[in-house]
Amino acid sequence: MALTKAEMSEYLFDKLGLSKRDAKELVELFFEEIRRALENGEQVKLSGFGNFDLRDKNQRPGRNPKTGEDIPITARRVVTFRPGQKLKSRVENASPKDE
């Protein structure tokens, strides 16, 4: 099971008493700000959670799995996430819930 933006909005509605519309907008604005920062080449640091970074990957050789033909994989920029120590600890110490 995955946590969705809709579930996050519902949680804000329940816990903070925001209207459903405001809760949904808050979640959307939060993620939009992260997207904007990354698009502008900025690192995103969320204290107690982790960091979103941009990494430039060089061109490298690859292979077409269907034909076996050698093809170049073009250089590109990717987003990486490094969890913070607090998040790592909480996940490691959490007991998994039955699905």
UniProtKB/Swiss-Prot annotation:
CDD domains: IHF_A. GO terms for molecular function: DNA binding; DNA-binding transcription activator activity; structural constituent of chromatin; transcription cis-regulatory region binding. GO terms for cellular component: cytosol; IHF-DNA complex; protein-DNA complex. Disruption phenotype: Increased in vivo levels of ATP-DnaA. Its main location: cytoplasm. GO terms for biological process: DNA recombination; DNA replication; DNA-templated transcription; regulation of translation. It holds the Pfam family Bac_DNA_binding. Changing residue 66 to S: Alters DNA-binding specificity. Residues 49-73 are annotated as: Disordered. The keyword DNA-binding applies. It is found in: Cytoplasm, Nucleoid. SUPFAM superfamilies: IHF-like DNA-binding proteins. Keywords: Conjugation, Cytoplasm, DNA recombination, DNA replication, DNA-binding, Transcription, Transcription regulation, Translation regulation. Heterodimer of an alpha and a beta chain. Part of the relaxosome, a complex composed of plasmid-encoded TraI, TraM, TraY and host-encoded IHF bound to the F plasmid origin of transfer (oriT). Belongs to the bacterial histone-like protein family. NCBIfam families: himA, PRK00285.1. One of the 2 subunits of integration host factor (IHF), a specific DNA-binding protein that functions in genetic recombination as well as in transcriptional and translational control. Binds to hundreds of transcriptionally inactive, AT-rich DNA sites, approximately half its binding sites are in non-coding DNA, which only accounts for about 10% of the genome. IHF in combination with the datA locus promotes ATP hydrolysis of ATP-DnaA, called DDAH (datA-dependent DnaA-ATP hydrolysis). Plays a crucial role in the lysogenic life cycle of bacteriophage lambda, as it is required not only in the recombination reaction, which inserts lambda DNA into the E.coli chromosome, but also for the synthesis of int and cI repressor, two phage proteins necessary for DNA insertion and repression, respectively. The synthesis of int and cI proteins is regulated indirectly by IHF via translational control of the lambda cII protein. HAMAP family: IHF_alpha. This is Integration host factor subunit alpha. It comes from Escherichia coli (strain K12).
